[in-house]
From Swiss-Prot:
Keywords: Isoprene biosynthesis, Manganese, Metal-binding, NADP, Oxidoreductase. The keyword Cell division does not apply. One of its GO terms (biological process) is isopentenyl diphosphate biosynthetic process, methylerythritol 4-phosphate pathway involved in terpenoid biosynthetic process. NADPH binds at T10, G11, S12, I13, N123, E125, G214. Pathway: Isoprenoid biosynthesis; isopentenyl diphosphate biosynthesis via DXP pathway; isopentenyl diphosphate from 1-deoxy-D-xylulose 5-phosphate: step 1/6. Coiled coil: none annotated. This is 1-deoxy-D-xylulose 5-phosphate reductoisomerase. The gene is dxr. NCBIfam families: Dxr, PRK05447.1-1, PRK12464.1.
Length: 396
């Protein structure tokens, strides 16, 4: 029986994780649920899953949850960063699902890694912001790191065991790997007229053709910044060198990524676009459990198509690839800028095409400095957010 902490319990990954746990009740126990401020959602989850601890990042939300929880459930409600770190590092905890969206997930995820936990990584920003520090912490603590993102999980499944066992430190070429093919659907605007992108609304951007996701990730998919962040994450997870990582547009989202070997072989991982599949894989690795996902029906799949990304249509993807080549400081800046820009777009403050412009302005103007600690990363993140908010006024 694995005791699990779910960071981001009220989000889409949290919901999928709890669904997999419910399908395998003899193997997993919800030790703690963590959310930001969604009191009613957390209350419902507590009643259903009976965790030992419910943690709310927002202190007022914690008080509201405490007042609403039936006392007979005997659930401890906590709040505060120190309490959260204590929770993910507790000796009772075996596995941490790291699914808090954005930079907010970095500190608790890194704490779980340093404590040597089995970390299921759905928070791509942790590696985007602190890749080298994160990988070194994993190595030092002996933590088990398993990628939840459908693409990275697909790549992981297509790799040899010696690479799987050495994430972040592997040598792809020595294992006969030519390159990794990171697939992406292209989002809802893949075939839209370029001239129409400036007028696209948040509702349109959030209508992904294949996946069910939260608003921030949905917008990132529409700009393909999501694929850009995944590109950066893959660079750290799989220790890719120049030209070992390529992005391929695959609109059907049936092939979740591929690995091409030196002998010309290509191994692909396929399945219905449902996050419960990679979540179940990570939870049970190296075994297999029920995910609740229907098996892929090849007679209904139809045509599978592929194309190169159009960087005129997806400038955010180009920015992410360029930032990855520049290094850790640039990717930290880009991530912070993008979070501010996407939130502004979702609130109707800027247009869809302004997201890339805010990102580009920050990437070119925010001073980069060497980062040797988590405090350095947080400081650069904060500095970038201030500059990004200043840029918003230019596009309002």
């Amino acid at each position: 029986m694995q005791n699990m902490v779910i960071l981001g319990a009220t989000g889409s990954i949290g919901a999928s994780t709890l669904s997999v746990i419910s399908a395998n009740p003899d193997a997993y126990r919800v030790y703690a649920l963590v959310a930001n401020a969604s009191v009613d959602k957390m209350l419902a989850l507590c009643v259903t899953h009976r965790p030992q601890v419910a943690h709310m990042v927002d202190s007022q939300a914690a008080l509201a949850l405490q007042a609403k929880l039936p006392p007979e459930l005997n659930i401890q409600v906590t709040s505060g960063e120190d309490e959260l770190i204590a929770l993910v590092t507790a000796t009772e905890v075996d596995t941490v699902m790291a699914a808090i969206v954005g930079a907010a997930g970095l500190v608790p995820t890194l704490a779980a890694v340093k404590a040597g936990k089995r970390v299921l990584l759905a928070n791509k920003e942790a590696l985007v912001m602190s890749g080298e520090l994160f990988i070194e912490a994993t190595k030092a603590s002996g933590a088990t790191l398993l990628p939840v993102d459908s693409e990275h999980n697909a790549i992981f499944q297509c790799l040899p065991e010696e690479v799987q066992a050495n994430l972040g430190r592997c040598d792809l070429a020595a294992s006969g790997i030519s390159h990794i093919l990171l697939t992406g659907s292209g989002g809802p605007f893949l075939t839209a007229e370029l001239a129409s992108l400036a007028s696209m609304t948040p509702a349109q951007a959030c209508k992904h053709p294949n996946w069910s996701m939260g608003p921030k990730i949905s917008v990132d998919s529409a700009t393909m910044m999501n694929k850009g962040l995944e590109f950066i994450e893959a660079r750290w997870l799989f220790n890719t060198q120049k030209d070992q990582l390529k992005v391929v547009i695959h609109p059907q989202s049936v092939i979740h990524s591929m690995v091409q070997y030196r002998d010309g072989s290509v191994i692909a991982q396929m399945g219905n676009p449902d996050m419960r599949t990679p979540i179940a894989h990570c939870m049970s690795y190296p075994q297999r459990i029920r995910s609740g996902v229907e098996p892929l029906d090849f007679f209904k799949v139809g045509q599978l198509s592929f194309c190169e990304p159009d960087f005129n249509r997806f400038p955010c993807l180009a920015l992410a690839i360029a930032a990855c080549a520049q290094g850790q400081e640039a990717t930290t800046v880009l991530n912070a800028a993008n979070e501010i820009a996407v939130e502004a777009f979702l609130q109707g403050q800027i247009g869809f095409t302004h997201i890339a412009k805010v990102n580009e302005a920050c990437l070119s103007s925010v001073p980069k400095r060497a980062m040797t600690s988590i405090d350095d990363i947080i400081a650069l993140d904060a500095q970038t957010r201030i500059y990004a908010r200043e840029q918003l006024a230019k596009f309002a």
